[in-house]
């Protein structure tokens, strides 16, 4: 296309390519669309060259700007008379442009016909002379110069070698003919955006803060000489092209391997608990402190101190463990005497804690009788201080209450001279069973540690409901029976209810266990109480009533007669016999001191506690126990610390069974 310019000096000494005619392109952006007349020159087009240009090669896409091999040059090709024409073109490999000065009108007519790669350009003047040239296809609509080249020339054309963004826009519109008619806001959006991108992405341009306030920054050429062309295009970070995730996966694998190695190394230590697979403490040592804080809650389905999901004995796992390697699992004793009430220290906080946990455990699934038989055969409670710390409370087939440190007893029914008291446990009938496995040694304290007020608190509190089974360390101190009472009864339906809590007092320095297990009894006749030469001791009063209403219920039960004859029980109860309306008299301190000197009992004392508990306490039809007199007389009670439950007297009537 030929373009006539007024005869004036070129701005900034930059040659402008007059060949801005429409080009054949597969797409259109801000570049001119393809027209039928490919030669948009105001002069007469060359039809032959136009035909060639109409089907000539497409303008290729803008290549990467790392093309520094072909230096762009701007050359003033010539003038005709006092008229001049600026031609801006790229100095390609064989690019040649012949300018024929026209003698007519002083205006040069420049026509370039672009063919394929290496096609010659025919330049025709007014005289029709033509000259061919070889050149490559143009990279852009305004020529082969890129935006970066134009920006560079714009900045270098100034005296201060710096321009603002708006000044660069003005230079483009003023110096490059292609942008002359694209200076308005509607048509300048595309190329101005390209200018901004090139300024930001090219390392050859730097931005300098303008000293004036509220003014745009200066754009300058990088004095350090940035690399030519655009910077590599940045890609969005993904899991495919980023090594961040690879590094994180590697760190995680290394950490896991180190933890595994440390865990394997600590397994060899006898103090580690990883050999206990059922214990939550079978972890690495760095996590041991955290887990032991709440292991008793997380390892039980009832949120109690029980370390197992059910009272089913787990002797298979524990038999292989040495006694000195006792775990921190709450189902085992920590030490022979640790945290256990002793003679010198009253039990102040143990009782409420156990009672609270007793309420939380409620196994409502009925268990078959044969399963309960197996369970009870494995239960063993011993107060021996010589027992190993790892002894489970579920081992033997009898409860042993010893005053001389007796060991695990056999299921016998005799009460020997040493004061040990053995009675068999029979199966519980299919009923909701609740159990507590205490993790401390269960011992008894002497009677003088407790006061009447604390016993009243125990009787008035409702924390021990009649449906709870309690295995506790409290000392309601029912004295050891010294009568010779035997009965013919099968090993079934022993009922240790927690409402009349039965406990057995040993000597002040000895220990025993109190077991209250709630199970519904099966009605079975008891033949008779036989024999009897000794007395039930003076502390039958403290049967551990949980509800104050038991006093009324026992009085209510006296209206029916005792179905089985009871023989002489004691010669120390002031001649009182167990019969209808028997009231236990107040005993003098001179004969039965509060420390229960058991040496006053002579001979062999035999007692079938199953019969006593079953018949006298649970089915006592005609017994009237007067507890108030003995409580005041003996000053025997429990010191239970501070119960968590509210102290209120229940008015409900307790009915056994």
UniProtKB/Swiss-Prot annotation:
Localized to the animal hemisphere during early cleavage stages. At the late neurula, localized in the anterior neural plate, neural crest cells and in the hatching gland. As development progresses, expression becomes less localized, being observed in a variety of organs and tissues including the head, branchial arches and somites by stage 32. Keywords: Activator, Apoptosis, Cytoplasm, DNA-binding, Nucleus, Phosphoprotein, Transcription, Transcription regulation. GO terms for molecular function: chromatin DNA binding; DNA-binding transcription activator activity, RNA polymerase II-specific; DNA-binding transcription factor activity; DNA-binding transcription factor activity, RNA polymerase II-specific; protein kinase binding; RNA polymerase II cis-regulatory region sequence-specific DNA binding; sequence-specific DNA binding. One of its GO terms (biological process) is regulation of transcription by RNA polymerase II. Dephosphorylation may promote translocation to the nucleus where the protein induces transcription of target genes and triggers apoptosis. Residues 142-236 bind DNA. Residues 246-257 have a biased composition (Basic residues). Residues 268-283, 297-307 have a biased composition (Polar residues). Disulfide bonds: none annotated. Transcriptional activator that recognizes and binds to the DNA sequence 5'-[AG]TAAA[TC]A-3' and regulates different processes, such as apoptosis and autophagy. Acts as a positive regulator of autophagy in skeletal muscle: in starved cells, enters the nucleus following dephosphorylation and binds the promoters of autophagy genes, thereby activating their expression, resulting in proteolysis of skeletal muscle proteins. Triggers apoptosis in the absence of survival factors, including neuronal cell death upon oxidative stress. This is Forkhead box protein O3. The gene is foxo3.
